[in-house]
């Protein structure tokens, strides 16, 4: 054997071993650093969606980071210079505060205040980096080629200062305002939430739904039927709302009169009488008596008003309105200029001692209020109503709608621009553009920005007691106002900054809000660069960024806020392309969560599964479709792509080393198989590039799976004799050259997805660079593509696969020759020589449809025939048993009819099926429109030839175990039993030729290796012939 040019994969080496070896190589040779510095002719701007490192990275994070890495590696290999190839860390907000509260055992905001904001925030600051080392370790193991040396961190003063600059800009352009209004509110966290936060926390729940009667003022026995799913709001009732255009009826029921929407009356009442009909606007202005007489209603309340939001789809068509606890209700109260009635504190408990439910959490009081209504004759009907209700997306508490002072960004005023900029974005999957994301833009609400919390970017607004407002846009402005800039811009230090109001001379104090943490991550495009205070970000060239990706919930989270801020600030979409990723479920298809105990942490799982195998699994199927974390699927996908490609390489390396082959460029292909594979290689490059460019990475995996399968199970199997030839001929060198090119090309195509094994193969094949990731993505040579040849060979492979499948079904091994194979369909005759090399058949024939050895069976299709034949159906069905199935088939072809017992039957009335005719002894299967028939009758001669092939296989295995070269000659001793003796007698020459055997000795001898073949056991010994 020649000196080894191509390293052999050590026996027992796993994919995990290879991945670890390459990771060490990258570290030892600073490969990532060289990737980061790689220049390019095209610009690609990356943006990392910042995680919070106060929790461990789970398996879903590993998938997201894999996809980011694929994009980075592919664009690096295709000549792009990657800008901003660094990570980011989200550091503020409720997620961090809640973990801190859990650590300290705090239950309310008061606990934090009593403990001390400074100490609490100090803990929060430290906690956000608790697992940062684990995150970076996972990034390294999974192969995420990101530069952590330049990570942006949202808690840094520079980041906060950039946000202040933008907030001041938004304020000065009239898009940031303060209002007292009803907002989504979490009573556990004691803070309001934005619409995009609320959108992430909806759950389907069953709440009590009640129909209650409000007595019309001044009437004897007349009531309004009002409906609500929040009985706890009834003590705060101020109005009843009707739709001005809906028809209402005054009905009589059980000696009482009721106003109700005409279309809903029959749902609420039975056996009622309609007294009068009117439109909703005719009810406006009517007064009614207070339902629950505990609180003092404000002047102007307790009357019927109109509102377009009322419908008659459900309920009664009359809505009870408590302006303190509903957005529409609040607007009604504001329109009617009536103060709100709010007996609920910020903890979500009734706080007015006059109420029987004082001190209770409002939602927990629902049932007690219903009992009160029933006992006092105020309840008409109650039931459970299933609807979607918002919960706090962080602490899982049901939200309230609650009146507060808050600062808002006027997103509604730029809604049209948001929609317009969305049209410039490429979405994957594309239905998000006008679906989940686009619909949210169409209804974009003003952004509730302020949070009455502690750990976050401080809202930079100062106010004096005369209500003069000053927005600060930089640290320098604080100095200009005569104050000292604290070293840390967070609370409580920023709260201590006070200055003189330039308008009135009074002291200005900061309003004690922090901002929505989503504004932090949504500012990453510019704040990460300390814009505009450092000259390293130019919106005209650095926006939009090229690509972002995160989980599906971020379409209404990070994706949304990026889009809003960029549109308002720069009048541009924030990103060109966005890929949304669905969830990794557990093996049973359940969503993972800590509470269920089925969470899988990335670092733990990567100790069990090779990173390349896991990465490949992540892209086995579209990433926007959920997939179960199934180890069997991971192993199967890895086997089909990675293991098979490694086996192909092993075959190449072993044989190339024997023959001293050295790749010096692709040789001119003369063999049909070489021409086909070279054509396939170039088609593979084109299709893979297209899939990568379209962000269809799962399609790259499918294409690679098909290519590796073609390479291993078709090209290599049909070409192996060329590699085993004794002499190093021109044909053999061409085969080596073609196989080398196929392995190298496949490695480069797979490099972004399977970075470790691809680099292992690249280095083993002596690629020209230190790493495959410093090389370029392969370019296709379209002149080498022969679509007709590919089509023919694809058909040949399809036939070969079908024959293999039939053999497996009828338990005839591939080494056992069969008498005949028949092919029927649109078959290219030129494939026959190729097919014959692999299917081990004495004869292959193409036959017409009529010549197929089939038996036709015919029966009635009862669903269509029975209604027509009626009482004759059984007699016709019996008569069909005596009719030739083929004749029936021919009769109904092309719209014809079959006459049976004076009935004319059409093809739609018949079930005509075919099975192989048992008289001929064939088994059948079909693929891609080609019928394949394998004759399963084996005669004596064919049977003996099959045994001879079994002997050859065992001798070849023994040669391999002895590490013999293919050129080494051997002597063989066989102790046969039964039919094996006849097989040796008849096929001795064949056995000797196939095994490089000089002498074949039959009979018992010492040191025989026992082999079980079928039901027999034979002994074989081989010995290398030493040249004299």
From Swiss-Prot:
Catalytic activity: tRNA(Ile) + L-isoleucine + ATP = L-isoleucyl-tRNA(Ile) + AMP + diphosphate
Motif segment ('KMSKS' region): 591-595
Ranges spanned by the short sequence motif 'HIGH' region, renumbered to the chain: 51-61
Spans traversing the lipid bilayer: none
UniProt enzyme class: ligase
One cellular component term from this protein's GO annotations in UniProt: cytoplasm
Residues annotated for ATP binding in this entry: 594
Enzyme Commission no: 6.1.1.5
Cofactor(s) required for function per UniProt: Zn(2+)
Location(s), subcellular: Cytoplasm
Subunit structure, interactors included: Monomer.
Similarity remark: Belongs to the class-I aminoacyl-tRNA synthetase family. IleS type 2 subfamily.
Domain text: IleRS has two distinct active sites: one for aminoacylation and one for editing. The misactivated valine is translocated from the active site to the editing site, which sterically excludes the correctly activated isoleucine. The single editing site contains two valyl binding pockets, one specific for each substrate (Val-AMP or Val-tRNA(Ile)).
Designated name of the protein: Isoleucine--tRNA ligase
Species of provenance: Thermoplasma volcanium (strain ATCC 51530 / DSM 4299 / JCM 9571 / NBRC 15438 / GSS1)
Lineage, broadest ranks: Archaea, Methanobacteriati, Thermoplasmatota, Thermoplasmata, Thermoplasmatales
